């Protein structure tokens, strides 16, 4: 499997959605779907790392699968609103690197190599 850029992923999702008459859902429906997927990830995290084991009849899902679902919905959401996620990522990293540059205790170079 080849590594894809965010632009590649956005194009792949757009091609996939483009084959259906319905196209992208409305922003409000997309947000509801995102909330649903985050809830499913939360449930899996709780089963794996929390105090609530799965019921015997519950299917095994992987955390990776739930994260993939969230990524797919996020890309659908971005595409429907003409948001370039690569640009959004660059902008948010710039914000964190400037706003929060002194917020956290940095690892010293000697600590990184150990």
Give, region by region, the residue ranges found by the protein language model:
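Flexible "arm" and connector segments at domain edges
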Residues: 1-67, 71-114
